[in-house]
Curated annotation (Swiss-Prot):
The active site is at 107 (nucleophile), 132. It comes from the Bacteria. It comes from Mycolicibacterium paratuberculosis (strain ATCC BAA-968 / K-10) (Mycobacterium paratuberculosis). The gene is clpP1. This is ATP-dependent Clp protease proteolytic subunit 1. It catalyses: Hydrolysis of proteins to small peptides in the presence of ATP and magnesium. alpha-casein is the usual test substrate. In the absence of ATP, only oligopeptides shorter than five residues are hydrolyzed (such as succinyl-Leu-Tyr-|-NHMec, and Leu-Tyr-Leu-|-Tyr-Trp, in which cleavage of the -Tyr-|-Leu- and -Tyr-|-Trp bonds also occurs). SUPFAM superfamilies: ClpP/crotonase. Cleaves peptides in various proteins in a process that requires ATP hydrolysis. Has a chymotrypsin-like activity. Plays a major role in the degradation of misfolded proteins. Fourteen ClpP subunits assemble into 2 heptameric rings which stack back to back to give a disk-like structure with a central cavity, resembling the structure of eukaryotic proteasomes.
């Protein structure tokens, strides 16, 4: 298996052999996608996956800053700081970033889906998008002054998440706050109406049959 990209697999990742004029090499689906400028976020958003995604974004930009990068997303979400690290890198690189939701983009992953280049944010017909307010992981304990600090941090994260979603959806921050007070689950069409994506993709097979 090619050691260059090691996703957080929960099963044995299939590998295959490729023959070329340069010889024989062993590859896997993630490396093959990377060669096509495709990043696949298929795990929880945490420090490890964020570092992997950021590294791939920066490498692909250095290889060709004028070609689009595609990010496929099927993720339950994750930590806020990891989310913002990926988000900032997406905004930092010069290449346009297409985002495509396969399966689900929940919580932090929904923000990344919305953060793609305008006009290039997509989802498959049965994809699910979930947005809600951020939270701190674990039980909050400590002195009262520490609890105040934690409460202020939660409010800061919530405000930042609301303004970020507002920037990319066209909604105002007050609407985002109201909608994310509890879990808000959207179908692909509803996510399009909300401004999180621009297009609900058709199945390629059906498109070919009707062409």
């Amino acid at each position: 298996m090619n050691p260059q990209i090691q996703p957080q697999a929960r099963y044995i990742l299939p590998s295959f052999i490729e023959h070329s004029s340069f010889g024989i090499k062993e590859s896997n689906p993630y490396n093959k996608l990377f060669e096509e400028r495709i990043i696949f976020l298929g795990v929880q958003v945490d420090d490890a996956s964020a570092n992997d995604i950021m590294a791939q974004l920066l490498v692909l930009e250095s290889l060709d800053p004028d070609r689009d990068i595609t990010m496929y997303i099927n993720s339950p979400g994750g930590g806020f700081t990891s989310l913002m690290a990926i988000y900032d890198t997406m905004q930092y690189v010069r290449a346009d970033i297409q985002t495509v939701c396969l399966g689900q983009a929940a919580s932090a992953a929904a923000v990344l889906l919305a953060a793609g280049t305008p006009g290039k944010r997509m989802a498959l017909p049965n994809a699910r998008v979930l947005i809600h307010q951020p939270s701190l992981q674990g039980v909050i304990q400590g002195q009262f002054s520490d609890l105040e600090i934690q409460a202020a941090e939660i409010e800061r994260m919530r405000t930042l998440m609301e303004t970020t979603l507002a920037r990319h959806t066209g909604k105002d921050a007050a609407t985002i706050r109201k909608d994310t007070d509890r879990d808000k689950i959207l179908t692909a069409e509803e996510a399009k109406d909300y401004g999180i994506i621009d297009t609900v993709l058709e199945y390629r097979k059906l498109s070919a049959q009707t062409a």
